[in-house]
């Protein structure tokens, strides 16, 4: 073959000078071995050094395209490069001056020849090996006759399968690999999580000094207390509820049974709730009692509100967050959509107490979430992974958390969040209150509940998670081991008469000993333990199923998975190693709808297991004997973690809570500082930042809630007076005092905590009529009407008949008569007003309005010609803050009333009032400054 094509005496490499394989020839040109000898030696492992560069074949040049030996097998064709566009490097001729300069370059020059040569040596070595492999394949293919290349060659699909066989992990991200895949009901694998977040490191709670907190706020309503046991069963049956656990609270059937205060009830009514859902009827009393709960209900059953409402009350009892504090309540849910939904509910109900909520979930801005957490929020709604990220980055901490909720726990387990959920629970203080909600109650959820809940109450709504109540558990407490043998021999014949008996022992040696002893007593029985051959075990199980042997003595390992419906009695001769094993043991009976009995024999040394057994019995709605409970109480950890019974804490006694916000309605009877009014929390708690921080917004919210909560139609006020709080307070639709009959008015004004005075005292700068005390009276509904109604209220209290006349006179003379009435109110009730200012400490709460009850300051504020100030005094006159001052005001007005004739001219009354203002009224009050002449004087 001519290798010198293209020019005389010039050696050319492959791929140059027209070398091609003609398609028509039968004999394909073979690649002779000696044709590679020219460069085969140079392509040894020693590489191509600087000593012999001319021997480099042209297709091994840097950046050049390798030769295409076979068009059908373009093995080394590089499709990304085009040989026509590649600039080949310049290599000077041998013995040329340029070549000599190239060799004479110093070693430490800036050129990068050394790394390049090392790399090229490796590339050329690999290329030489590939060339040899290609030649061998060509030889093998040429030697085989009658084989079609198009069939034998590897196509795309075969290449893909070969590649996947060689690289089983190709394309699989390492984080997505899961050893244990979960499968859904159809048998399809559930996709694992996209990202595994390392759980939080373990924490030693004994080194942290946690402040105590209160969990129990539930006081049972008398209607629920009076229910008989049968009525209670009927109520739960009507609500389709099944409740199990130690001493569960009775369910309520209306919102009145929960004892919520007016702020929260206002938001509940606003959310269009008419009555609680079944899960709320039982779940809210459980959560208010401070008990741990497992709630099993379908989506849409109202379980979200069932843990949000008690959460708000739980938070309100604790002290306010300080800078750097973490949340008080944490709600963990599986998906960001559910997280946003629960966050919206928390915001809706939390604004009743100005509580802040933050949603923390994957996919949201990490920086914004961290900023919101650092500003402080009482409630955090989160997904597990993102909360762990924030805790690791010190954006928040879990030290203040005392209310922990896991919503849709089964979905979190399906998504692979088990370790994260457990690490979050382990980072929260051990004496927390934990609520677990799930749509199903699989074994994993049951195990989690046992690990993170203490004495939980299980509330099942609907037909989900049907508890197996076919097994009756009986616990026998015996003095010693021999007592067990006596008990067994005495009762075994009785048990075998009703069906097959399965005896459990813990160890193999004990099983053999017990079986031998029973055989000596004449009992026909079988033995089953882990060291037996499979054939022997199969024969024993077969005989037991056929009822050839009525008694079977077995260990735990051998008995797992036994499904024999004829077993009527299970006897735990030795207690199980743990409660899981115990559950498996007793599950051997009561199968396929058959009833069964499980006996457990305990001795005094089994106190550790007794605690677990008590909780297992309570969870299965089984009777717990006093002897068993006493034995369990000998165990220190059970005694310490056991729930405490008793009545719930009555809130608002002596203040307390976030910013000492008053909480009327939760059993509050006597209050030292708080005032029983709906709006008091707006006054007491103002966040430093946020929408509710400024006073104008607080006043708007106060007015809105005041009008909506205390609306009473004017025509119905006389009928409802004294029968309801709103009627007794005499509020009209405008928020001002209404004219009420004598008895009810006197009763309302003499009671220590009248809703009128309390509602008026709720907001700084508000008088009894619902107006701002320092503002001019320009609204007829809240100003003039308030004055007229107040006057008529005074007349009705004094017992005179001048009510109609006065109201008529004030209504006709809107100008001067209003002014004179303000002076009269000042004259009549200076004394009680000054006493109130010192006693009730309004100045303590709001220094800017502390002198609202001082006479001099009030007169000094007559920027509007004295009108506003005097009307404010009139309001102050009616606002007797306690029993004494009201009586003083009442007596004083009774004495002064004969001097006030209904038809006195307003100008004369003005003069009289101006004189009486200057007289001493028994208090060391500074002389009021001279009043400027106002337009009312004319």
UniProtKB/Swiss-Prot annotation:
ATP binds at residues 297-304. It is found in: Cytoplasm; Nucleus. A motif (DEAD box) lies at residues 407-410. Residues 116-157 form a coiled coil. InterPro entries: DEAD/DEAH_box_helicase_dom (IPR011545), Helicase_ATP-bd (IPR014001), Helicase_C-like (IPR001650), P-loop_NTPase (IPR027417), RNA-helicase_DEAD-box_CS (IPR000629), RNA_helicase_DEAD_Q_motif (IPR014014). Gene3D superfamilies: P-loop containing nucleotide triphosphate hydrolases. Expressed in several cell lines (at protein level). Expressed in liver, lung, tonsil, thymus, muscle and pancreatic islets. It catalyses: ATP + H2O = ADP + phosphate + H(+). Keywords: Acetylation, ATP-binding, Coiled coil, Cytoplasm, Helicase, Hydrolase, Isopeptide bond, Methylation, Nucleotide-binding, Nucleus, Phosphoprotein, RNA-binding, Ubl conjugation. Residues 1-18 have a biased composition (Gly residues). There is a cross-link at residue 899 (Glycyl lysine isopeptide (Lys-Gly) (interchain with G-Cter in SUMO2)). One of its GO terms (molecular function) is ATP hydrolysis activity. The modification N6-acetyllysine is found at residue 5. Residues 284-459 form the Helicase ATP-binding domain. Residues 820-920 have a biased composition (Basic and acidic residues). Residues 1-114, 182-203, 737-938 are annotated as: Disordered. Residues 738-833 are annotated as: Necessary for interaction with TP53BP2. The modification Omega-N-methylarginine is found at residue 12. One of its GO terms (cellular component) is cytosol. Residues 35-52 have a biased composition (Low complexity). Its EC number is 3.6.4.13. GO terms for biological process: protein localization; regulation of apoptotic process; U2-type prespliceosome assembly. A motif (Q motif) lies at residues 253-281. Belongs to the DEAD box helicase family. DDX42 subfamily. Transient component of the SF3B subcomplex of the 17S U2 SnRNP complex. Interacts (via the C-terminus) with TP53BP2; the interaction is not inhibitied by TP53BP2 ubiquitination and is independent of p53/TP53. This is ATP-dependent RNA helicase DDX42. It comes from Homo sapiens.
